[in-house]
Amino acid sequence: MGKPKAYYRLLLPSFLLLSACTVDISQPDSSATAVDVEAKTWAVKFQHQSSFTEQSIKEITVPDLKPGDLLFSSSLGVTSFGIRVFSTSSVSHVAIYLGENNVAEATGAGVQIVSLKKAMKHSDKLFVLRVPDLTPQQATEITAFANKIKDSGYNYRGIVEFIPFMVTRQMCSLNPFSEDFRQQCVSGLAKAQLSSVGEGDKKSWFCSEFVTDAFAKAGHPLTLAQSGWISPADLMHMRIGDVSAFKPEKQLQYVGHLKPGIYIKAGRFVGLTR
């Protein structure tokens, strides 16, 4: 009986690394009573790579949006596919809805403010997560920050450094029993592998870096981790019901899908989603 157990102990970490699967395994709440049989079971939570954490999705329209909402998207292009492969995620881009049909984002053309119509046109799939307790004043400050750095460059160096980091950080998922270990491990690798730019010296951003900085400037940080460490997938996993690599200040709320995308539509067709 000893050998099979040893094999399982070796295979489980290997499976987690190869599949880039982040897992949380935790004991039940200490407040649960001893007679509560169900509470004695261990809680196992897997990271959701899809754009939704439940089997059903909610389709929304533009009037459902609020200033400060996060717009996550992917396209059918090669670049989007590559980002999704390396980040083992269903998203490759994140932007901020400013209100009045305007969107702030950082793309290869730099930091821009574009129409929501244009942002939707360039996306195959687009869904919305909301930051809890964001005030109108903070939303206004996010818009002011976007206008201030508009036409700044794109952080190509940060993206190049991010590619090996996204691979090596998967090692931090090998211990599924400690959320603190995983977050400290990822932060340690980020410090070792990624460049650090002083706040006043920053002249360029990639998409999730811009989003993270915008909320920090508004006094409502999404996470205390450095913005240059954060990918679109990291922000997506900060939602309720998911497992995040970096600790969120507050978990994001799923609002709905503006565009389901071809994969979700195909899943509906064969009955995998609804």
Predicted regions and their residues:
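Sec-dependent bacterial lipoprotein signal peptides
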Residues: 1-19
